[in-house]
Design a protein with these regions (language model features):
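Short linear functional motifs in flexible/disordered or boundary regions
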Residues: 50-51, 64, 98
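Short, solvent-exposed loop/turn segments at secondary-structure boundaries
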Residues: 22-28, 64-67, 179-184
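Serine-esterase "nucleophile elbow" of acetyl-processing enzymes
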Residues: 1-58, 72-82, 86
Length: 207
């Protein structure tokens, strides 16, 4: 993109880190958040205002971002067509260790009756960190092959719809949490992210 072109909108596909401030969740317009910091820097460079279209949710993996891009009409019908650049900021949740398959964990809210759901949720919250400490995590939340596949689909879809607009990706972030007391999969996920980005000629920001 030449310096004479005006950058107006940046589409950010993210997870909870896109709206998580130092003390917790904040409004998506908070200037401390990385999508808004990036937009501010881009605005200075191009000399025109830049707005962020943030599509993110707590716990989102690359699969969820793909679903949002292809199933949410606001995203594929409004945000993507007007985007001058796309930031792919998912993949960090994919690498988190898990003690049960993700589809089972995500199915807990649908359990009925309510007492069964509440008991199952408490049991999971009590046992999962202990099992993770003991095992380092039996599996990832999403296999690396699936992460690469969904990220590739996102890039291909953006390029098919919006041509050669800039696409930037971010490496999986390190994490420190009592719920995920393991860095077991981080180094591999980070290395895989660089390999994936190189294969599709996508610039990667190392966080």
């Amino acid at each position: 993109m030449g310096s004479s072109e005006k950058l107006r909108h940046v589409l950010v596909l993210g997870d909870s880190l896109a709206f998580q401030g130092p003390q917790g969740i904040v409004a998506p317009t908070d200037p401390r958040l990385f999508p808004n910091l990036a937009a501010a820097q881009i605005a200075v460079h191009f000399g025109s205002p830049v707005e962020v279209d943030l599509v993110a949710r707590e716990g989102w993996a690359s699969r969820d971002a793909w679903w949002a891009l292809t199933k949410d009409p606001v995203v594929f019908g409004t945000y993507l067509p007007r985007a001058s650049a796309v930031i792919i900021a998912v993949g960090g949740m994919d690498q988190l260790p898990a003690v049960i398959p993700t589809y089972l964990r995500e199915g807990i809210p649908y359990l009925r009756p309510g007492r069964v759901r509440r008991r199952t949720r408490r049991l999971y919250r009590d046992l999962a960190p202990k099992i993770m400490r003991a095992t380092g995590g039996l599996m990832r939340q999403l296999p690396q092959s699936a992460t690469d596949r969904y990220l590739t689909r996102i890039v291909q879809a953006v390029r098919a719809i919006s041509g050669d607009i800039p696409i930037i990706a971010m490496t999986p972030s390190p994490y420190y949490s009592s719920y995920y007391p393991s860095q077991k999969y981080h180094d591999q996920a980070r290395a895989s992210a660089f390999s994936w980005a190189a294969s599709l000629d996508v610039p990667m920001v190392d966080i």
